[in-house]
Regions:
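Short, glycine/charged-enriched secondary-structure capping and boundary segments
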Residues: 32-37, 73-76, 95-99, 122, ...
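N-terminal Rossmann-like dinucleotide/flavin-binding domain of flavoprotein oxidoreductases
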Residues: 1-12, 89-108
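Rossmann-like dinucleotide/flavin-binding elements
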Residues: 45-92, 132-137, 148-158
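A conserved short coil-to-beta-strand element within the FAD-binding core of flavoproteins
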Residues: 1-4, 108-122
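FAD-binding core/adjacent interface of flavoenzyme oxidoreductases
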Residues: 1-56, 131-135, 144, 168-170
Length: 170
């Protein structure tokens, strides 16, 4: 029968079948949708060493497990605020109760609307109350975005694999 030809940077393979095992694709964090957010050096999507934020003003965006867990972790070492667009969090009930009992400043239902800063460093986050014109300004040293992840199947398109509704057509 017909053979598939696969060319890599090192060699050429021929096979009767090709199995593409890539799960949901490559994952990357959902970006903060505020104009210019990518230009600020203190807008983060992951934490590598929590101790470096000790004593600094930390704000966490999101309402799921990661956001609540990070807010609780930061609270032990830094003044911490969490901003979520809904009144209720999607995190584990136990974690949400712990959050409510903690010193974390909880801002709900608010969404981030503007970053203010200079020289590539944000100093304040403006938040807007949902279904309202009410705004607040939060001083920040660091902003952590925990909006989950999105998957990408970009390589498949580049490879010329035929897709149907973001899935490989078989």
């Amino acid at each position: 029968g017909d053979l598939f030809t696969i060319t890599t940077s090192r060699q050429v393979h021929q096979s009767k079948a090709v199995i593409i095992a890539m799960g949901g694709g490559a994952f990357k964090p959902r970006a903060l949708d505020i104009e210019g957010a990518e230009d600020f050096d203190n807008v983060h999507y992951h934490v590598s060493n929590i101790q470096q934020y000790e004593g600094q003003q930390v704000t966490v965006l999101g309402g799921g497990d990661s956001a609540v867990d990070w807010a609780l972790a930061f609270e032990k070492i830094a003044p911490t605020t969490i901003v979520h667009r809904r009144d209720n969090f999607r995190a584990l009930e136990h974690s949400v109760e712990e959050l409510k009992q903690s010193s974390v400043s909880i801002k709900t239902p608010f969404v981030p609307s503007r970053l203010i800063g200079e020289n590539g460093h944000a100093t304040h986050l403006e938040i807007t109350k949902v279904k309202s014109d009410e705004t607040e300004l939060i001083p920040i040293d660091h902003l952590f975005v925990n909006y989950g992840f999105k998957s990408s199947i970009g390589n498949l398109k580049e490879w010329g694999v035929e897709l149907q509704r973001h899935k490989i057509k078989v």
